[in-house]
Design a protein with these regions (language model features):
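Extracytosolic ligand-binding ectodomains
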Residues: 2-9, 13-435
Length: 435
């Protein structure tokens, strides 16, 4: 999956393209302190976007930030959280590498005043940094897809996007429904790119397909002629794939040069604009449109919650990475918006910004209960809570249904080469056929 997952080499062009300010919404950075445990004062509260903003996965950070900025702006417009009238979205660049991410996380925890929540980590650095945030008692909504967090004991870890293994099953189901009898799996050899590899292989086999080749290719090589020749010799009817943009572009360009470009299905790591642009340039836009689809978590693009999200992000269009329209239907940006709203409403419900106090309310506010008022954004929820109502938050990604490990499994969509147009949608029950 986008294991939130892709390699950890440098791709400077994309990093430059997606450069964003280190602190948004025009608010100054807060002072330093030794731990993050909410605030009893009235100063700004900080939500951190802890994701790659540089390196091959540099698109992950802006994608999460595109959810944080509109949520924070709307919270500020609604009067803030308790005595805190300003909410800050702060970026922290993990660089997509655990070696860089650990000191970055430690610095974030040690120096950010009133840090009350984190968007992230991604799969690139989650295993190394989730324990740090958990020990510091900071709620985090991970965009990691790693299966290791399917049943984790981290009390401050939440996830409302499906794990990588589920993405692999969705890819397998779609390939089977399209009638592809054989498949090759071509994935980058970094850990993060391979989150969906085991399940797309096992799932495709279970529902009757044949895997004719599995390749774990080294990243960012100048040529993959040997690997491509082996692929062609295996005669797959479809390719399952994830690697970083540069690697995928080089590999698929050589497949095209040898006259064997055919259908390929990517993880949600491939549905990002940098990947689609790089591969589209390499194989041609028409070929990308004709042969490619990608699997990603489903997010509805109709209904009242979506319209709330759309209105709020359009209100801050100039503050997110451009073009802003790329985030309108992005399931991870929508999930980030929901995550900020849930944490903010949990503070209001708990009457505290101390994570140890408000953390249990995150699950409570997402869970249906008799007589609960259904709300779709922070302002609605705050108003209802202040009038003594019980609420259920149903946001842009739909109903959040946390399991005992604080994961919320969801549906999947298969999207076209624009990264958003849906060509198929599967519920979690439907993809279970491949498990």
């Amino acid at each position: 999956m986008r294991s939130h997952a892709r390699p950890a080499n440098t791709w400077a062009r994309r990093a430059a393209l997606l450069a964003v300010p280190s602190l948004v919404l025009g608010l100054a950075a807060c002072g330093s302190h030794s731990s993050a445990s909410g605030s009893s004062g009235t100063g700004p509260l900080t939500f951190a976007v802890f994701n790659p903003f540089s390196g091959p996965d540099a698109s992950f950070g802006p994608e999460q930030l595109a959810g944080c900025i509109p949520a924070a702006a709307a919270i500020n417009a609604a009067g803030g959280i308790l005595a805190h009238k300003k909410i800050v979205c702060k970026t922290s660049d993990s660089r997509g590498d655990p070696a860089d991410a650990v000191p970055a996380a430690e610095q974030l925890i040690a120096t950010t005043s009133s840090l009350v929540g984190v968007l992230g980590p991604s799969s690139d650095e989650a295993s190394a940094t989730v324990p740090l945030f958990n020990r510091a008692r900071i709620p985090m909504f991970g965009d990691t897809g790693q299966a290791v967090f399917n049943q984790s004991s981290f009390k401050y870890f939440y996830r409302i996007t499906p794990p990588d293994d589920a993405v692999g099953y969705a890819m397998a189901v779609y390939a089977h429904q399209k009638g592809y009898p054989t498949a090759a799996a071509v994935f980058g050899n970094d850990i993060s790119s391979q989150g969906s590899l085991p399940t797309v292989v096992s799932g495709f086999k279970k529902i009757g397909g044949k895997i004719v080749l599995v390749q774990k290719i080294p990243l960012d090589q100048s040529s993959y002629r040997t690997e491509v020749s082996a692929l062609i010799a295996a005669h797959p009817s479809v390719i399952f794939t994830e690697a970083d943009p540069q690697t995928s572009a080089t590999y698929l360009a050589e497949v095209k040069q040898l006259g064997h470009l055919g259908p390929f299905i990517g993880t949600d790591g491939t549905t990002q604009p940098p990947w689609l642009k790089a591969v589209g340039n390499a194989v041609g836009a028409q070929n990308l449109k004709h042969f490619y689809v990608g699997a990603q978590p489903y997010a509805p693009t109709t209904g009242v919650p979506y319209q709330q999200w759309l209105a709020q992000i359009k209100a801050v269009n100039g503050q997110v990475s451009q073009p802003a329209s790329q985030w309108y239907g992005d399931s991870y940006s929508l999930a980030a918006w929901d995550s900020i709203n849930l944490m903010a409403l949990a503070m209001v419900a708990a009457k505290s910004t101390d994570p140890g106090v408000f953390r249990p309310w995150i699950v409570k506010l997402a869970t249906p209960s008799p007589g609960a008022v259904v709300v779709h954004d922070f302002a609605q929820g705050k108003a209802a809570l202040e009038h003594g109502k019980t609420i259920q938050y149903v946001g842009a990604t739909g109903q959040v249904s946390f399991d005992k490990w604080q994961n919320s499994p969801g549906a999947f969509s298969i999207v076209s080469s624009d990264g958003s147009t849906k060509v198929a949608t599967y519920t979690s029950a439907q993809i279970s056929a491949a498990k």
